[in-house]
Amino acid sequence: GGINAALGRDDSPEIHAEDTLKSGGCIAGEQSVNGLCSAAPEIIRSLERLGVVFSRDENGEVALRAFGGQSRNRTAYAGASTGKQIMSALIREARKYEASEVIKRLLGRQFYSALIADGACNGALLYNEKTREIETVYAEAVVVATGGQNLLFGKTTGSMQCDGYAAAKLYEQGVQLKNLEFIQYHPTTVETPQKRMLISEAARGEGGRLYYIENGKRIYFMEDRFGKNGNLMPRDVVSKCIYDAPSQVYLDISFLGEKIIKSRLLEVAEVCKNYAGIDVYK
């Protein structure tokens, strides 16, 4: 995977924002998009200070790969373990605040409901998995970040714990909800008996090509329809085209070579081998 930031010499937060709004069908809030894109370069630098080792190019600059819906290469990545490195760095930082008692973590708890009185949220009720009791936590501000509702769609690349309970419970409690139709999903996956295993967009960012077979011939349908960068169209476009394909769709990265795959797409290779018995080097 990776994280987008306008770090290239031919790029800017303004171009980044323009690409983002265009890829989102101009539905996204322009002010929020501008703020996020403007902050992104400093976020990369902050993550570096926290210990994330981003890959470098031949000039020693943060390496940038292509991702869907972008007019510039602007996806920074840390080898084949971007997400893991970012999470590890943030957890280490959080533990510093925990050690100094600035924050307190409550482990083994699940969100049960919001604590609402007189139209205001004053905290939350949590289910203690160990004691099987409901606990009350009071707070001046409450953020419910429980991971969405991917499980409602059956097989998913997301966590099987993301069942939409929190949103449903808050709705029952009279909380106004918006934008529930926007569900994060991924167009390229490997099917397993239990769930879908994600094939990172990085595979297409490094040159992977989508195709189906017709009369014994490979049809590179994304390139046929959208040109040489067709495999890097926004996710909704790629997903619709895969869905409309007349037969099984495949993603070819074998031509990238073992060196590139091991250095940049190792996680993809391991997922395919361990969960589906597929050797991506062939």
Per-region residue spans from a language model:
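Short beta-strand to alpha-helix junction loop
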Residues: 28-41, 75-92, 106, 156-164, ...
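Conserved redox-cofactor binding core of oxidoreductases
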Residues: 48-133, 138, 145, 189-193
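Thiamine diphosphate
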Residues: 158-171, 177
